[in-house]
């Protein structure tokens, strides 16, 4: 008995992945000009950029830790083959070839284009507010350990003799800072802690700008972890928003309650609805801002920014970053936040229909 099957026949008609693939196909269709500029007319056949981006979407949604693990799963997961428009008997990508081709996406800043195209899909559906926003930042642990944090000049701290490669190192009494030390695994990662109640770690800083209507991500950035990174990046993301004639609001936690940030936000055309920090100091905003009902609304809405951060760190696998270097991790962060938006968009499509 001969039976012919395609992956299309095996995916339920009402499976949520169908709605996501439909939006992804539209997004990729808008990026044809970008893809054309990435490849020469001749040369050896390569992994299509559409397949690379679709694979990245699957890796974020299904919490796949590495590119090699994805290629292994692609051998037997028919849903993955369907999402990538592959035949049942079509072999999976070679893991080494797959990883090398993904570097081309980084060179052409494809992650930024993909994120922007997803945001446009949300705007076309009128899911995004253009007046009220929130900003926040978090630390993302780098793919580097404390043992790799060594002096830039001079000998490393003493270790136990004959203890092998993974020997214990005694840092007691040794002053370590980003000025004098750097990670040998990821030199761009910085040793930083967000508060006195948490330990320092080698990390990067992730930043989000969300709107208040449905909590969708308007912009995302990954930078070096510094004391001013959150405020500086928030100002930059706000300035990238299209200008409007009427005044808009931006909410934030107490970390944004500084004179410089409030002044920068006002000059950019926004009213700062940041939480007041009155611990042994005077807040940068006063009753002229906090007396309005909109301020209380912003303080309630700003907590929604924790939802995408939580998703990125758990489902998206970002609690510990998987790449080395700021550029590669930034591209991953852009793609993962775009996937979060994709899931929210398709969920809203179903709820509103």
Task: Set out the residue ranges of the language-model regions.
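Polybasic low-complexity intrinsically disordered regions
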Residues: 75, 84-264, 339-340, 347
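Conserved, well-structured core segments
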Residues: 54, 207, 307-311, 334-339
